[in-house]
């Protein structure tokens, strides 16, 4: 015991301690979960880098690519020098409140150089240089949590997955042609510029397409590059020299040419004349080699064998210059005769055998009608710009701009690297245009594929798909803005007097600022952040979307793109993806994955050296990984880190195989590296079916933060990581001592990282009842007490859905799996009333209501309490400014903000005249446009914000809010000042105590030794007047004083800045004079119709809330909280929920045992049994807390935490096994079956058989019945059709559709039907008449013509069909009249 206490370790109760079931040690830490966003944007802005030393990346690269800009005449040039950011005008919190964008002003330093141009020689001399900083709009900044604040709302820029630039080879899988023949194609995809496709057709002719236009023969493209026919042939084919030998031809023998060939005629040695192989024999590789080894140098062939070959060079009469045969011509009988006539002794033939080498290029050349570079260029020009007549210059310039101009074409570094790798080229990644060699290499490789050599690419491999994160997306967007600006600058440079202007005069930054604003405001990838809970925030930031500009579309994406690919392992989660049309197109990054500088996703692996697994970790992309043999993280190792099995299951080149252990060179880092954050939070994920796991990981993101968060008993160990990285829980920036704590802020006196230039105080403002994007409640609660010592990174406050620094999305509830009177039929959920009474699943939702007073044509609107025709009762909660008080309880129809709007003059009725005479002007010329609570909404007002335009007088309420805010700022300043004083004067006291002072304040006698008593006689401010003998110490004291004065000034300056911001008027949209926002909090208890779910995809709707006494109960009288249907488990195959139930039961049982021992300790003071129980529960290993080193107090704190239920962690794929669960149940003295006898709450009788009971973690999802239930009597109508609107948001009605009409027809309910189709829908006159009849107490009314009929008539008239309505009765009367007159 003494030994245990000797090496004590403290436990402060501020974190949740879990028993770990994982056996695999973590060799590397998980990277920060929002690093993807932060790193990418930091790399784009490079704020920290010095102005002159920034590398050419991100924003710097954009400016470098657009500048310098010269004018059209070349007399002036605008150069880019550098850029810098000023401090943002408002901080994050102020931007949120004022609906502003959190951004910093961007200042670009530009240099304008003016030249003197000599008209004769054209030489330039510098005449003038002007440098100036130019404001280029605001650049949005990222918050510490990886989000952007745009117009006051938090947004996330989702990373995009797109096909990597480079070259790709593929075939059509035999689908294009009826013969089923594979047509091969290559595609060169640049990052920016024209796509080049090279493809075979069914006749094996090779064509090129530029930007998917009309195809042209590939030889035309090669001619346009400056090659002629013989160049093309000599590039793609070898020559074989045939020499005439008597009546035949002699050709050199090569193994490559003859191997695998079936001989048509005898093979004759040209030197000896003997037959070395007979006709009909197939030469194997071995036989062909054997002939060469025997000394066969050349063979003789007959004239007939020459037929079908192709000439490599022209056959020319050198005297006359006549060409008898051209290069590429096929040798037929006629050609043989010509060869005989011109007595050619030696000819060069193309090495084409139609087996190993095909005649595709030669055939394409023969099909191609173009014969020169000019023809080819003209042909390409006509394809790209049809209808324009080409000239040689324009055609050449246009062709050059397609692939060879860095302005128009950019492969990017990635594209060049991929191209080099694929085709074994050696070209630096700074060359980002296409070269002639690249195009030739692509054609050669395509021909090789057609000849059966090489492999096609898999476009779904993650080596061929890359991620574009925030920084890169923003870079592309900003480049577009700058290019728009470039045109305007060029024009302006030519039109102004260049000698007198400054850079500022040439630049209009609007296009660049507009591009940024457009991207953040309306891009498909800039999304409203999902802020339901911390997990949904983190997942949103780690999302990878294949949609968006330059990506796929839902309709065109096939099955292959959406499917899970072997390379996803450890990079993209195979589980978490939405159900529905986006399945597989929106993915989530795996837990350990990161994105490298080229945009490829990398996963970490442990290195294996000499058969021993090391702790060295390397990150590899999918391309690099395919070369290695990778073992799984759970492969069994011995104590030295060597594999125990002879053969190890591993992955290699996309396949899973058993490899000998000495082949294996890498190993996974962790079993959870293949899943995403949300999937890694599901315990026993390995026991759930994949479809249900998908639902589980998606539904955790919809869990509403509850009033009382509770971490799960059965966790996975990921909970604390998510809470920390999401920023929901507040962690300490520096170590220190807690100085003050209240509900709204924590003040910590720093003891580490003390930088003289920074304050020695950290003030953490906690968010209290703030509204999230999804209207859930963000509320932070302090965990520390005054005097507590905290270390850097410690959790000091819990946020929404966090409990002691662990993610807590739901609650642990006692579940019984059994049917109960049909109330859990079809996944319904039966709940106990205790859940409602104890607010177990109660959540707070905050709704925001906004009202603006505008300046209208008829006069300004006014926010006031003086509203016409409103009873005083309705105004009881409004203050004198007409704004509701904080704390007021409101219900549907209540006025939140009183507002009146002037209305136009209209003729007055006698009543109005009377009112006007009595009450004066006000009563008649305004109407009530107050903001009222919408139907179905109840709650309490928690916050009011008032915004005024500059120069508009503030009302009393605005002044009160302002005063409150300034008091809060002053309190912060005073607290920081007092801690600063305390620290500085403590240091000064240390410096002066015991020293002899040679000078001092008035009344001090020199030469005395200073101590606390002497110094206590003088006010602290006079201590600085003491001067000591030691000069070095005196200079230190003076430095301290200077630093103190500077800190005080900086503090006061900061305070004054903030006060000035508070007092300054607000920037308002045009026409708005004043704006009021009211926040109403609603407490939502759980009720029938709400959706709930577990973590395993086990979702359901609450069907009934049963009184506690009627719920099934255990032997000790404990009632179940929730009853689930056992039939929901087998068919869904999510057995994880059952294992969680058993383990949760064991946790609660163990907690009860510990609780009993805590009570024993409190009674007797004997802690030994408690210590023994906890030490047995938490054996010493790498994962568990070192409880053996805890002192008694720490152990007691831990036991108090555990008595509600022991928290455990069972990591995915490395969690508790059946045996572990059995052991836990036995330790807690529970039946190892996990089943108990339950009693019926209504009869008290035991149920027939034991029931599975335990604790399961249930979530309340954001699909609440209160948000969905809706009823309407009268409401708005559509303007055109005059029919009622639909949907809750529009306060619409239920549609009486076609089928419902049939039902009424079937019943013969003619009058009801007529009513439905006219007066209850779109008969405008009829509706009014019905209302009047009801008012009169009448029940007679007449239906008129539905408005939709009039719409139909109007539509027919628009098609020039005149339709007129005639009164039937009149027509009949006329007809009767005419009949009678005829008679």
Curated annotation (Swiss-Prot):
Disulfides per UniProt: none
Lineage of origin: Bacteria, Pseudomonadati, Pseudomonadota, Alphaproteobacteria, Hyphomicrobiales
One Pfam family of this chain: RNA_pol_Rpb2_45
InterPro entries in the cross-refs: DNA-dir_RNA_pol_bsu_ext_1_sf, DNA-dir_RNA_pol_bsu_external_1, DNA-dir_RNA_pol_su2, DNA-dir_RNAP_su2_dom, DNA-dir_RNAP_su2_hyb_sf, RNA_pol_bsu_bac, RNA_pol_bsu_CS, RNA_pol_bsu_protrusion
Assembly behavior: The RNAP catalytic core consists of 2 alpha, 1 beta, 1 beta' and 1 omega subunit. When a sigma factor is associated with the core the holoenzyme is formed, which can initiate transcription.
Function: DNA-dependent RNA polymerase catalyzes the transcription of DNA into RNA using the four ribonucleoside triphosphates as substrates.
Keyword Transcription: yes
GO terms, biological process: DNA-templated transcription
A Gene Ontology cellular-component term: DNA-directed RNA polymerase complex
Family to which this protein belongs: Belongs to the RNA polymerase beta chain family.
Catalyses which reaction(s): RNA(n) + a ribonucleoside 5'-triphosphate = RNA(n+1) + diphosphate
Keyword Transcription: yes
PANTHER family (UniProt xref): DNA-DIRECTED RNA POLYMERASE I SUBUNIT 2 (PTHR20856)
Protein species of origin: Bartonella quintana (strain Toulouse)
GO molecular function terms attached to this record: DNA binding; DNA-directed RNA polymerase activity; ribonucleoside binding
Keywords: DNA-directed RNA polymerase, Nucleotidyltransferase, Transcription, Transferase
EC number: 2.7.7.6
Protein name (database record): DNA-directed RNA polymerase subunit beta
CDD domains: RNA_pol_B_RPB2
């Amino acid at each position: 015991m003494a030994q245990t206490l000797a090496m004590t370790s403290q436990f402060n109760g501020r974190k949740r301690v879990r028993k770990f079931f994982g056996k695999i040690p973590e060799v590397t830490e998980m990277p920060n979960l929002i690093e993807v966003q932060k790193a990418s944007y930091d790399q784009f802005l490079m704020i920290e880098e010095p102005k002159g030393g920034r590398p050419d990346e991100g924003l710097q690269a954009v400016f470098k690519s657009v500048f310098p800009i010269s004018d059209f005449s070349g007399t002036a040039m605008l150069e880019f020098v550098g850029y810098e950011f000023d401090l943002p005008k408002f901080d994050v919190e102020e931007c949120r409140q004022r609906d502003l964008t959190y951004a910093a002003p961007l200042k670009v330093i530009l240099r304008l150089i003016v030249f003197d141009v000599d008209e004769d020689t054209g030489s330039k001399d510098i005449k003038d240089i002007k440098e100036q900083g130019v404001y280029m709009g605001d650049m949005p900044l990222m918050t510490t949590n990886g989000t952007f604040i745009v117009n006051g709302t938090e947004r996330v820029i989702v990373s995009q997955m797109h096909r990597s630039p480079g070259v790709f080879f593929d075939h059509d899988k035999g689908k294009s042609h009826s013969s089923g023949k594979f047509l091969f194609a290559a595609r060169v995809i640049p990052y920016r510029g024209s796509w080049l496709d090279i493809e075979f057709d069914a006749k094996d002719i090779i064509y090129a397409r530029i930007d998917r236009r009309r195809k042209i023969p590939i030889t035309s493209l090669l001619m346009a590059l400056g090659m002629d026919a013989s160049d093309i042939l000599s590039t793609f084919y070898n020559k074989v020299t045939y020499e005439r030998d008597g009546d035949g031809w002699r050709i050199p023998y090569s193994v490559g040419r003859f191997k695998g060939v079936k001989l048509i005629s005898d093979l004759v040695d040209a030197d000896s004349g003997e037959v070395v192989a007979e006709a009909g024999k197939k030469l194997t590789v071995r036989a062909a080699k054997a002939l060469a080894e025997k000394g066969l140098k050349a063979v003789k062939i007959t004239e007939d064998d020459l037929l079908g070959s192709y000439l490599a060079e022209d056959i020319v009469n050198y005297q006359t210059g006549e060409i008898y045969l051209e290069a590429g011509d096929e040798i037929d009988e006629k050609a043989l005769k010509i060869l005989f006539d011109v007595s050619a002794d030696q000819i060069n033939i193309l090495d084409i055998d139609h087996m190993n080498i095909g005649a595709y290029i030669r055939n394409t050349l023969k099909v191609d009608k173009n014969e020169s570079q000019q023809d080819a260029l003209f042909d390409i020009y006509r394809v790209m710009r049809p209808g324009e007549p080409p000239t040689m210059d324009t055609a050449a310039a246009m062709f050059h701009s397609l692939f060879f101009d860095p302005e128009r074409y950019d492969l990017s570094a990635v594209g060049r690297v991929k191209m080099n790798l694929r085709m074994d080229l050696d070209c630096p990644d700074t060359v980002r245009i296409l070269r002639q060699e690249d195009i030739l290499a692509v054609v050669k490789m395509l021909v090789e594929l057609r000849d059966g050599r090489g492999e096609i690419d898999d476009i779904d491999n993650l080596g061929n798909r890359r991620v574009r994160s925030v920084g890169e997306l923003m870079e592309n967007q900003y480049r577009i803005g700058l290019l728009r600006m470039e045109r305007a600058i060029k024009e302006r440079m030519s039109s102004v007097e260049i000698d007198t202007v400054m850079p500022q005069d040439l630049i209009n930054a609007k296009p660049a600022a507009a591009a940024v604003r457009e991207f953040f405001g309306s891009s498909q990838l800039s999304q409203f952040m999902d802020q339901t809970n911390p997990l949904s925030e983190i997942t949103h930031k780690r999302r990878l979307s294949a949609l968006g500009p330059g990506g796929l579309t839902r309709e065109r994406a096939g099955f292959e793109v959406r499917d899970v690919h072997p390379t996803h392992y450890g990079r993209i989660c195979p589980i978490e993806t939405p159900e529905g049309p986006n399945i597989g197109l929106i993915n989530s990054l795996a837990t350990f994955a990161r994105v490298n500088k080229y945009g490829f996703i990398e996963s970490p692996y442990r290195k294996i050296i000499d058969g021993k697994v090391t702790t060295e970790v390397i990150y590899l992309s999918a391309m690099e990984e395919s070369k290695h043999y990778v073992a799984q993280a759970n492969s069994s190792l011995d104590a030295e880190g060597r594999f125990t099995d002879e053969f190890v299951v591993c992955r290699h080149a996309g396949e899973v195989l058993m490899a000998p252990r000495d082949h294996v060179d890498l190993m996974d880092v962790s079993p959870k590296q293949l899943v995403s954050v949300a999937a890694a939070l599901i315990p026993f994920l390995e026991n759930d079916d994949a479809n249900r796991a998908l639902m589980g990981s998606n539904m955790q993101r919809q869990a509403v933060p509850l009033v009382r968060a509770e971490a799960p008993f059965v966790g996975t160990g990921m909970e604390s990581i998510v809470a920390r990285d999401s920023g929901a829980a507040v962690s300490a920036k520096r170590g220190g001592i807690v100085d003050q704590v209240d509900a709204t802020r924590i003040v910590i006196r720093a003891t580490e990282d003390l930088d003289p230039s920074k304050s020695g105080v950290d003030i953490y403002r906690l968010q209290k009842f703030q509204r999230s994007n999804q209207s859930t409640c963000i509320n932070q609660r302090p965990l520390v007490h005054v005097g507590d010592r905290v270390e850097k990174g410690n959790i000091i406050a819990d946020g929404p859905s966090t409990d002691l620094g662990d993610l807590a999305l739901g609650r642990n509830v006692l579940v019984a799996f059994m049917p109960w009177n049909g109330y859990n039929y079809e996944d319904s959920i039966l709940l106990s009333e205790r859940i409602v009474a104890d607010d177990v699943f109660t959540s707070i939702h905050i709704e925001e209501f906004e009202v603006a007073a505008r300046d209208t044509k008829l006069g300004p609107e006014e926010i006031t309490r003086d509203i016409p025709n409103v009873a005083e009762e309705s105004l009881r909660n409004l203050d004198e400014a007409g704004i509701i008080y904080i704390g007021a309880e409101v219900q549907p129809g209540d006025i939140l903000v009183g507002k009146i709007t002037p209305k136009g003059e209209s003729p007055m009725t006698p009543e109005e005249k009377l009112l006007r005479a009595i009450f004066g002007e006000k009563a008649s010329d305004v109407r009530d446009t107050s903001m009222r609570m919408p139907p179905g909404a109840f709650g309490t007002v928690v916050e009011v914000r008032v915004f005024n335009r500059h120069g508009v007088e503030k009302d009393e309420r605005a002044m009160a809010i302002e005063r409150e805010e300034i008091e809060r700022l002053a309190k912060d300043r005073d607290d920081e000042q007092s801690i600063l004083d305390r620290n500085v004067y403590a240091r000064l006291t240390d410096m002066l105590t015991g020293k002899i002072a040679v000078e001092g304040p008035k009344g001090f006698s020199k030469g005395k030794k200073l101590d606390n008593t002497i110094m206590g006689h003088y006010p602290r401010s006079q201590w600085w007047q003491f001067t000591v003998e030691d000069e070095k110490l005196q200079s230190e004291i003076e430095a301290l004083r200077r630093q103190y004065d500077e800190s005080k000034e900086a503090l006061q300056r900061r305070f004054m800045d903030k006060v000035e911001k508070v007092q300054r008027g607000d920037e308002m949209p045009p026409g708005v004079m004043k704006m009021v926002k009211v926040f109403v909090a609603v407490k939502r208890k759980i009720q029938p119709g709400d959706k709930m779910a577990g973590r395993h995809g086990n979702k359901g709707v609450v069907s009934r809330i049963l009184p506690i006494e009627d719920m099934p109960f255990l032997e000790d009288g404990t009632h179940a909280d929730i009853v689930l249907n056992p039939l929901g488990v087998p068919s869904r195959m999510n057995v994880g929920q059952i294992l969680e139930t058993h383990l949760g039961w064991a946790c609660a049982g163990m907690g009860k045992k510990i609780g009993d021992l805590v009570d024993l300790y409190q009674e007797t003071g004997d802690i030994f049994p408690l210590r023994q129980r906890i030490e047995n529960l938490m054996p010493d290993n790498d994962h568990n807390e070192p409880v053996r080193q805890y002192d008694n107090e720490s152990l007691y704190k831990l036991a108090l935490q555990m008595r509600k239920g022991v928290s455990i962690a069972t990591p995915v794929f490395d969690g508790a096994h059946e045996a572990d669960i059995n052991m836990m149940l036995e330790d807690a003295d529970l039946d190892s079956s996990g089943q108990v006898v339950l009693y019926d709450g209504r009869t008290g009788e035991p149920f027939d058989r034991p029931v599975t009971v335990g604790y399961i973690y249930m979530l309340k999802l954001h699909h609440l019945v209160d948000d969905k239930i809706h009823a309407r009597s009268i409401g708005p109508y559509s303007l055109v059709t005059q029919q009622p609107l639909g949907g809750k948001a529009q306060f619409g009605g239920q549609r009486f559709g076609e089928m419902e009409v049939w039902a009424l027809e079937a019943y013969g309910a003619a009058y009801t039907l007529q009513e439905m189709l006219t007066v209850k829908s779109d008969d405008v006159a009829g509706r009014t008449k019905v209302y009047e009849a009801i008012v009169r107490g009448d029940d007679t009314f007449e239906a008129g013509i539905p408005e939709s009929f009039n719409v139909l008539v109007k539509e027919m008239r628009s098609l020039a069909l005149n339709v007129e309505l005639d009164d039937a009765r009149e027509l009949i009367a006329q007809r009767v009249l005419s009949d009678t007159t005829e008679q």
